[in-house]
């Protein structure tokens, strides 16, 4: 369902982008199979990828950028799911180098402090070494811009990781539109932003938002 929600939220880029979930037995990460779009993914299109990139279970090829997920999960025991997409508003916003501001509720999930940025390369993450670099750039935060590439988000479960990607894209869209209006732009103080984060996005409310989007997917 996470993949289909990302498709609903316009984060598809043909067959590229992925969602992962930590294998409960420690064997690696469950990921969508390559060569398929987010909107095509069901349980049969999910494969288990080992820490070294071997397909252990399921039918299909693994994504070349699996190290984004395996190295992030290795580095962050608190994380059970990661998302990588080429979300268009986020890619456009990150290219400006501007700081993300808490203009909207959505942005308060990420700032303060400033959202992480991975800038070592805008190319594909094809090696474990680059996967480690992404994890280092992310640090202990819930999201990072992969500048000239996409985004990576994470959480203690698939619901949180996916909703974090959804909310980051919406925050970037709001800021681009606000700045593009040509007028002055205001945003919440750090104190208010942190308060809004706690009030707007506790796990129960993220679950409600997920459930709503899941209903939209089912109705489509």
Stretch-by-stretch model annotation:
Residues 1-220:
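Glycine-rich flexible loops
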